[in-house]
Amino acid sequence: FYMDRILAREGVCSGNAGSNGNADGNTFLTRGRALYMYTSSPSVIGFGGNTAYHQPLGRGDLVRVLFSNADGSLTTKEDTSKRVNAPSNWSSTYSVGSNLTLDVVKFIHQENVAVTTMTLTNKSAEDQAITVAADSIFATEPGKVTVNGAEQTELTGTCSSPAGLTTIYARMTGDGFEAASSDDYCWLSRDVTVPAGGSVELKVVIAFTTEEIPESTEQYLRFAGLGNLEAVRAQKAEYNLYWAENLPYIDVPKKAVQKAIDYRWWLERFNSLDANIPGYDYQSPVTIEGVLGYNNAIILTQPMHLQDTKWLRSPYLAYGQLLSAGNSSQSSAFLDNPGNRNNWNNHYGQYLAEAGYEAFNVIGGGAELAENLAYYFGHDATGQLEHYGNHIEGRDLIAYRNNYMTGNDADTISMHAPGTGTWKAHGENAYVWAAADAAAKLYEQLGNTEQAKYYRDLADKIKADVLELMWCEECQKFETYAVRPTGTQHNANQPNLVKYTESNNYNYFAVGLVPDDAASVTKYKEALKAFSNGKEFPIFPFYTANQVHNQEVSGSNPLISTRRACSSAG
């Protein structure tokens, strides 16, 4: 399978995850729609690490498999040279004691079912009697389950997902395993005799089921009833079928560039969540800014993901993003998804309406969808103005007091230039215009002339204010507008303008706000000369701040590329 082949990581991979994830770069690559491993511990046979269901649960391993004989516990050690970490499955080989080897292939199915298949081989000349134990902190209550018409032992458990968004019902079973217990703690146990020179197959299946995803129960029972080879083949085929059905064909001559594209597609799938949780958070599929880091559907980066996901043949993720953001924002400016309440839940500067309108043009849809999107886009524009638009009297412009609202944090050097005061109108006004413009266009297509006129008039007002207040005639570029500066910045005729610029000051070009008649092109194209000399905005690496200006007012992270220009899935 192509994606497995091109993206597989062999052996121990290098990488520095900073404060999150795995320092060795060996994050488990397969995941379910909501169940995944926030960290991975390959030394644990099964699924070791910090188990996550839409967010880390902080309760440790999902499942452990241990071995013992009459003399006591058997030590296991991975042969890391045999490790292959592929998008659909993870495989490796372990030594068990002194004369046994264990081949492991494990995966997490789309429907939140984690399967560990094992082949235990005896290298000695004598039969070996072994006890295999499998335990999970999430499933400790013994019971029975019917698999392929026959009863077998099952362990179950219940817990709440982070922030109490849903209830998880864990279910675990294994081929030939029975319940064992000690001090009120229960696990699965199986005694096996591995013949001299022979092998024994083992399998443990655990699922996180919920009321809102009945498919998890169906797939749990299905994989519990499959043989090892059947289970692995089914996972590989079904996981990779997604790519065959969804990816547009792109032929890139340079293999390194092609791999980067493939990896980006994989990132969009890995950094997504389809938990189907009722309410105003994860009720629709969403993309996440780094499931191993921020782990939030932060509104700032939703349009960046959408620029990718709109090209998938299935609209489930692209439209899931839009419907989730629109519904969660409740008739106001687009808001961070509230599902992760440890994060900011703010109305950041973002261009989701512009990207959403582009997605609608690519994917298509009916009048009902267009009506919803127009409503969301329009209320994002008016909501932004309600939240941040009361600082410049008589103008339809938003202003921020904090540099992180732009997404570039301290590298928004114009926001902390000396003498600029507290509030600044910045390049995110382009996105407010784009939201009003997108709403107007959709209402025009729907034939709703009243709403179309309302948002067209609003877009025109924003455009007029931007062109009048934020264009520096002296410097021939768009600049940040200090609402109440403590002194003239650099232009006596336009004393509110700040000369220091970032890539965000060019948002007006990106969204199409800048007029394109002949006279306007002649005038405004002068601003683009900053990209021509390689000193202000180098091609690579691409910096957030104008690097000439950054020498005068340094940002904290000059090497961080702007999210708008070089978006990442996390």
Regions found by a protein language model. Name each.
Residues 232-371, 378, 495-511, 544:
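Substrate-binding groove/exosite segments of carbohydrate-active enzymes
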Residues 274-291, 320, 326-342, 383-418, ...:
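Glycine- and aromatic-rich loop/turn segments at beta-sheet edges
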Residues 555, 568-569:
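Short, positively charged low-complexity motifs
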Residues 1-255, 569:
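Terminal accessory carbohydrate-recognition/targeting modules of carbohydrate-active enzymes
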Residues 58-61, 68, 87-89, 317, ...:
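Amphipathic, well-ordered alpha-helical segments in soluble domains
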Residues 1-58, 294-297, 352-353, 359-365, ...:
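C-terminal capping/lid segments that line or modulate ligand- or cofactor-binding pockets
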Residues 241, 258-263, 385-399, 421-425, ...:
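Catalytic cores of carbohydrate-active enzymes
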